Amino acid sequence: MEMIRGRGIPNGVVQVPNLSANNLLQKFFIASNHFCQRDSEHGENQQEAKKREDEAEEDEKDVELTLGLSLNGQFGTDPRSRKRRHFELGRSSSIPEGFVFDEQRSGGGNGGDMRRIVGRGGSDMFQLDRTRSLPVVTEMDIEKERKVSEKTRAFMESPVTNRGAYLTKDKNRGQAVETEKPRAFLEFKIPPTKEGKKEKDRLVVTGPVNGKGKNGNTAKKQKNNVENSGMEKARNILEDMPCVSTRDVGADGKRVEGFLYWYGGNKEEVKIVCVCHGSFLSPAEFVRHGGGTVSDDDGGDVMINPLRHIVVKLPSSSI
């Protein structure tokens, strides 16, 4: 057996049976056929391997779109993929750590050499931290709250110039504020309207205060007119309803008094109100109420007109 070296063969050697020098052509054909057979087998193996890779890539295209999450998982990729480590998006921590490099985690010095730190931990610089569940207060919000608090503090500590008082920071400051509030409320004046001004002008009496001058006696005359009108009303009432009393004295030695509530031309139309009881009585009932006797036409003492036993007090005498 002879050993012939060739390219594209795993061992690079082909065993050929011993042949004479005349059979060199046969030896060449045997080696060529063997090489072609090996090349065809190797090509088939490469095609099968390529086909398997294509199928694996097609499987990787079926992305898992579920919302399920897991620790140290990935989002939107197939966990069974062989290329997962090249496309995965690792879950970051909920608490942002900032740019903490390897040297800082190990506690080496005060940060060590910055170039060495950046060189070893450069990948950490571009990692995205996971957003927090709670809303993050921005610097603008913090600055706005600080300005509002400063304005409020300055307003509370500023002097009150309009009221003529200065509020200090001592313990009596609260009492001063409480006393200034009602004073400001009392000093507030409502501007008069046109109707109120007209009413005020109508009620104001023109003329000097001491009563001298052209219209000096106006107030005094108005007062006298009010008094006179009151007396006139009382006189009219007494004239309409004059006071009456019984002529005879009763058993208790007193006369019964009342006043005429209404009267007309006939005696049946006269009504007298008793002062002691407030009852409406006829003239005969009023005389009987005072202790007198009123008889019918058939019996003993006849009082044809009971008004003779009633005394009417005129307004001039009552006043």
From Swiss-Prot:
InterPro entries: Ninja_fam, Ninja_motif, TDBD. The keyword Signal does not apply. Induction: Up-regulated by abscisic acid (ABA) and salt. Down-regulated by cold and glucose. It is found in: Nucleus. GO terms for biological process: negative regulation of abscisic acid-activated signaling pathway; regulation of starch biosynthetic process; response to abscisic acid; response to salt stress; signal transduction. Keywords: Nucleus. Disruption phenotype: Exhibits insensitivity to abscisic acid (ABA) and salt. It holds the Pfam family EAR. GO terms for cellular component: nucleus. It comes from the Eukaryota. Predominantly expressed in roots and seedlings. Residues 39-54 have a biased composition (Basic and acidic residues). Its main location: nucleus. Residues 39-63, 99-120, 205-228 are annotated as: Disordered. Interacts with ABI5/DPBF1, AREB3/DPBF3, EEL/DPBF4, ABF1 and ABF3/DPBF5. Belongs to the Ninja family. Acts as a negative regulator of abscisic acid (ABA) and salinity responses. This is Ninja-family protein AFP4. It comes from Arabidopsis thaliana. The lineage of its organism: Eukaryota, Viridiplantae, Streptophyta, Embryophyta, Tracheophyta.
